Amino acid sequence: MATNTVNGVLVCSDGTNIPLKEELAEGTESDLKTDTVYTVSAMNVGDYAPGKTVVSALVSCDNGVGFCYILSQGLVAAIIPWSVKGAVSDGTPALCQPYTLKAGDIVRCMNNTAADREAAIACYTASGVSRIFKVTPTGGATNELVDLQTGNSIGDTLQGQRITKWFGTSVDGSKIETQGFYVVDALGNVVGSCSATNPIVQQPLFSFAATNIALNYKAQFLTNS
């Protein structure tokens, strides 16, 4: 696969900006390290600025983007807002809550082609948990988004928690036959909905939610092709 230049910045509470830049392969989740033009050597963010508290951030890819987050001790520690270059309307958005970097923390990014249909929901709960759910549709179907780390459903992953902020991304546009992404209960009733933004056209932004999650709940959307 081709590689593209992915850029980003993490803005810290003390005014420090951490510039990010890396040539990342399309279709492969990869580490996004610091920009050597400004930081001398390419480093993971936790090793470059341990103890700094990130309050806002943005990562931009050339053609398409699946998701981006800070990985800490094997878990999604913070969701980093993502976009395609030029499709930015809200500058560097605030994180759902400030996050203090630890040694070993890594920024992970999925750099995609423009044609890649990977869809994602970024969720933040009332208890401070951040998770990302994803799926790549291949035709007309009901597509379930599953946890990017475990492959589990939203019900298995966030059972007993309440989603308070989320956003969704998909390039499918008119192929989508639901109002964005739905969360359905065990009986198939819609209990939550999250709009789907095309990150090639518009920067996705978090919206407020109040969606309680229980066992056997699913996140899904319908496509016609």
Regions from the PLM with identified roles:
Residues M1-S225:
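Beta-strand-centric surfaces of beta-sandwich/beta-rich domains
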